[in-house]
Amino acid sequence: MIGRISGLLLEKFPPLVLVDVQGVGYEIDVPMSTFYNLPAVGTQITLHTHFVVREDAHLLFGFATEGERQAFRQLVKISGVGARTALALLSGLSVADLHQTVSNQDPARLIRIPGIGKKTAERLLLELRDKLDLGVSAIPGAAGARRPSTMGSDVLNALLSLGYNDREANWAVSQLSVDLSVSDGIRQALKFLSKEK
């Protein structure tokens, strides 16, 4: 129904962004891989979208690439994997990394992602085994490419494992410079969080 949104980026608060299109503000949930690569507020952006209609809500999910959206659509088709779980997977792994994880049948890599238990990881690997494309073909040079925001995902996972909630962890990661190492990113994020308390 809504396949793409182009407009002015008004607000960024992980994992939500607010995009103004002709005076209408759309709240869009995005994976952290997309969030980390967004331009500054006040800039024109285009997101590939997936629209979900539920009894209690209409939800819009946005992705920087068509490959991310295709992977999201494959993930939500799996029994027990909802939109939020699919978003968490794409926040913790790039599409290329997810493809590699499925190819290698590596459940340990999936279990590190918040909200993914052993049974869900095994079901994901089983059901995705025959659907290995996962949108990777839509990403130029994606065969083994790591997205630049892997550091952010690693820091996010570290903060969540230390007991910070999603909101705190995502906020702290959004404050980081993208050129930090993972260990420096964790140190800096912990400093941000200690100042907020």
From Swiss-Prot:
Domain of life: Bacteria
Claim: Nucleus is one of the keywords in the record: no
Chain positions covered by the region annotation Domain I: 1-64
InterPro entries: DNA_helicase_Holl-junc_RuvA_I, Hlx-hairpin-Hlx_DNA-bd_motif, NA-bd_OB-fold, RuvA, RuvA_2-like, RuvA_C, RuvA_C_sf
Keyword annotations from UniProtKB, A to Z: Cytoplasm, DNA damage, DNA recombination, DNA repair, DNA-binding
A Pfam family it matches: RuvA_N
Main subcellular localisation: cytoplasm
Region (Domain II): 65-142
GO biological process: DNA recombination; DNA repair
One Gene Ontology term, aspect cellular component: Holliday junction resolvase complex
Listed SMART domains: HhH1
Keyword DNA repair: yes
Location of region: Flexible linker: 143-153
Region Domain III: start-end pairs: 153-197
Single GO MF annotation: ATP binding
Subcellular location: Cytoplasm
Function noted in UniProt: The RuvA-RuvB-RuvC complex processes Holliday junction (HJ) DNA during genetic recombination and DNA repair, while the RuvA-RuvB complex plays an important role in the rescue of blocked DNA replication forks via replication fork reversal (RFR). RuvA specifically binds to HJ cruciform DNA, conferring on it an open structure. The RuvB hexamer acts as an ATP-dependent pump, pulling dsDNA into and through the RuvAB complex. HJ branch migration allows RuvC to scan DNA until it finds its consensus sequence, where it cleaves and resolves the cruciform DNA.
Domain notes for this protein: Has three domains with a flexible linker between the domains II and III and assumes an 'L' shape. Domain III is highly mobile and contacts RuvB.
Similarity field: Belongs to the RuvA family.
HAMAP family the UniProt entry points to: DNA_HJ_migration_RuvA (MF_00031)
Quaternary structure annotation from Swiss-Prot or TrEMBL: Homotetramer. Forms an RuvA(8)-RuvB(12)-Holliday junction (HJ) complex. HJ DNA is sandwiched between 2 RuvA tetramers; dsDNA enters through RuvA and exits via RuvB. An RuvB hexamer assembles on each DNA strand where it exits the tetramer. Each RuvB hexamer is contacted by two RuvA subunits (via domain III) on 2 adjacent RuvB subunits; this complex drives branch migration. In the full resolvosome a probable DNA-RuvA(4)-RuvB(12)-RuvC(2) complex forms which resolves the HJ.
Protein name (record): Holliday junction branch migration complex subunit RuvA
Organism of provenance: Nitrosospira multiformis (strain ATCC 25196 / NCIMB 11849 / C 71)
